[in-house]
Design a protein with these regions (language model features):
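Active-site-adjacent structural elements that line small-molecule/cofactor binding pockets in enzymes
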Residues: 1-244
Length: 244
């Protein structure tokens, strides 16, 4: 309602296992919890009066859920990482797919995206119903050099800290350079550079309908983020449309 119908949801199982004990859940129920909660979410989205029962929360009997979304059908994307079953689930349900890629090369996800499309086809959904999105850390500045200078320090600090907690090696300049290379997943650079990289990502995955940036994970200032958003709207999007 606040966004006047522009809001959409991306839902996924999540990678932060620390939340489970906070809510009194057992990590062994990781997948079952998500399957049940996704089922309830779609039920609430599609029906004003909900009758539903499950294992992990009280049942609902003809209960109304308000406020309703402004859209006739609130878009719900299924966010996935690298688990094949998650791609199959999205295809079987006919939900649009949002692939979260934070490391490696985008092309390595092509077999999983193909798995999604095949599962959707087998479930009776048409190709235009099976949308694919790509979510990745990214940042746009006036030049490649400026983007890297702005982005690298905060990115390295954050991911090195997370890595210490999870047993990952620290971020180095050479590893960062590999991630911003033509085949790497990070989308950091000038509008022209980013437009070219997004085109390569789309080709690598057999076509991408949407790309979402995660820009607030590198200690960027409010002004830097605002300018990046301006560049995306004023320069990057026109370039993408021109080359489409």
């Amino acid at each position: 309602l606040i966004s006047k119908g522009r809001a959409e949801l991306v839902v996924g199982r999540g990678s932060a296992v620390e939340a489970f004990p906070l809510f009194g859940f057992d990590l062994k129920d990781y997948d079952a919890l998500f399957a049940e909660k996704l089922d309830l979410l779609l039920k609430v989205r599609d029906e004003e009066f909900v009758t539903w029962s499950g294992k992990f929360r009280p049942a609902m009997n003809n209960q109304p859920v308000y406020p309703r979304a402004l859209q006739k059908k609130l878009p719900v994307w299924l966010g996935v990482g690298g688990t094949p079953a998650s791609f199959v689930r999205a295809g079987t349900l006919g939900l649009p797919l949002m692939v979260a890629v934070i490391g490696g090369q985008t092309a390595s996800f092509r077999p999983l995206v193909d798995l999604y499309r095949e599962a959707g086809r087998r479930a009776g959904f048409s190709p235009d119903q099976l949308k694919v999105g790509l979510h990745s850390p990214g940042y746009v500045a006036e030049t490649n050099e400026q983007a890297i200078a702005d982005y690298y320090p905060g990115y390295a600090e954050l991911w090195t800290k997370l890595g210490r907690e999870r047993g990952w090696p620290p971020v180095t300049q050479s590893k960062f350079n590999a991630l911003i290379a033509p085949e790497g997943v990070l989308v950091v650079g000038s509008p022209e550079h980013v437009a070219e990289k997004l085109a390569r990502h789309s080709e690598a995955l057999g076509g991408v309908d949407r790309f979402t940036f995660q820009m607030d994970n590198a200690g960027l200032s409010h002004q830097q983020l605002l300018r990046s958003i301006e560049l995306i709207g004023e320069k990057l999007i026109p370039l993408i449309k021109k080359n489409a």
